[in-house]
Amino acid sequence: MDKLRIRGGRPLKGSIPISGAKNAALPLMAACLLTDGTLTLANLPHLADITTMANLLAQHGVDIRLNGHAQGGGGSQGRVVELTAATIASTTAPYDLVRKMRASVLVLGPLLARCGQAKVSLPGGCAIGPRPVDLHIKGLQAMGASIEIDGGYVIASAPAGGLRGAEIVFPQVSVGATENLMMAAALAKGETLLVNAAREPEITDLAHCLIAMGAEIEGAGTDRIRIRGRDRLSGAHHTIIPDRIETGTFAMAAAITGGEVELVGARLEHIKSVAKILSGAEIDFEETEAGLRVRRRNGVLLGVDVMTEPFPGFPTDLQAQMMALMCTCTGAAMITESIFENRFMHVPELARMGANITVHGASALVRGVPRLTGAPVMATDLRASVSLVIAGLAAAGETVVNRIYHLDRGYERIEEKLVACGADMERVRETD
């Protein structure tokens, strides 16, 4: 397996292009199943999870064509992909593909809405606690679907005449369930109302794409989304939003090294909660013509408390990076994880580097230390792995991050982007 070797202590200075948002791209790719026309997506990131979704869509008969890179005012806007599901060759999403990524379950709603049936393996992905698909299933059942779980598969069929609109109240906020049901409702009969819906920018991005395909959707970005079903949707062209998690990650990397970077393409409105909390830690965000400039205010990094929350709160996908940042703060920080269980697996690895962290249930108390020390560490999931990279950038000596295949699931060319800003690091490719 590949590893990253990092020699820390060098401030990051320069500009970093922000890639298209993985968490927007995956549901947008699944949306191609809703139409026999061509869905063209620009600013597609080059990631392992994107490849997994492409392989899954190909299994369903989708014709996939990559057309290089689109150019825009800010330079390269990522890859452009054309997805055409003229006919659905299979309504089964097999275990060998779905096990690699939990977002694969997003084909369930589109397949069921268009074909009247779907057989989707229960999903895999990062090992960070349970993420049951119950909310997806209950929502589709409210729309008239018959669903059973057998042999590790969700087996669903729509009623005669197709899915029907319904009022669906989520007992808890779920991004994936909101996306799945919004796509299914776009082809359902009548009106669907999603109450306590997720409000993430990725939800709004999906809604904008579906509207371009002919869907009728109101309220995306609020907790009440209204969808009026259409008989059919058409193809469309859509540009994927920049990745707010990558934006926050590189902002924290710049801050922990005492550097200054411009995040090209980043949007402040997507990370307001992050910018507000980091401002309390003495980190400045400045909007520029190209994106955002990030730097420490007075050279000191102050400890600040953080609780993860659904958008517009602080994202759980930045919790591990925030913990790494707080390891060298002045004072202490209490970090509370309210979204997922078992998401502190990076703590023992940060401790190997000299971090002072005590876990109490869903909270971790981080007491700042003057300096972290390089060490061999092991990545356990996507966001934990990048927190170790952030820590390594600031640590004295050499840090080796093992099992970085997790990183490739969510960060495009991360070592290239960091090296371009002065980081001393390289990928070591294992041949065995």
Swiss-Prot record:
Which UniProt keywords are present, listed alphabetically? Cell cycle, Cell division, Cell shape, Cell wall biogenesis/degradation, Cytoplasm, Peptidoglycan synthesis, Pyruvate, Transferase
EC?
Answer: 2.5.1.7
Give GO terms for biological process.
cell division; cell wall organization; peptidoglycan biosynthetic process; regulation of cell shape; UDP-N-acetylgalactosamine biosynthetic process
| Reactions accelerated catalytically | phosphoenolpyruvate + UDP-N-acetyl-alpha-D-glucosamine = UDP-N-acetyl-3-O-(1-carboxyvinyl)-alpha-D-glucosamine + phosphate
Named from the GO MF annotations, one term is: UDP-N-acetylglucosamine 1-carboxyvinyltransferase activity
Query: Any S-S bridges, and between which cysteines?
Result: none
Which CDD domains would you find in this protein's record? UdpNAET
Report the subcellular localization. Answer: Cytoplasm
Residues that the record marks as modified (2-(S-cysteinyl)pyruvic acid O-phosphothioketal) are C126
Among the Pfam families in the record, one is EPSP_synthase
Q: What is its main location?
A: cytoplasm
Sites binding UDP-N-acetyl-alpha-D-glucosamine sit at R102, R131, P132, V133, D134, L135, D317, I339
- The residues annotated as the active site are C126 (proton donor)
Q: Which InterPro entries match?
A: Enolpyruvate_Tfrase_dom, Enolpyruvate_Tfrase_sf, MurA_subfamily, RNA3'P_cycl/enolpyr_Trfase_a/b, UDP_GlcNAc_COvinyl_MurA
User: What does the protein in this record do?
Assistant: Cell wall formation. Adds enolpyruvyl to UDP-N-acetylglucosamine.
- Protein's UniProt name: UDP-N-acetylglucosamine 1-carboxyvinyltransferase
**Organism of origin:** Rhodospirillum centenum (strain ATCC 51521 / SW)
Q: Which gene encodes it?
A: murA
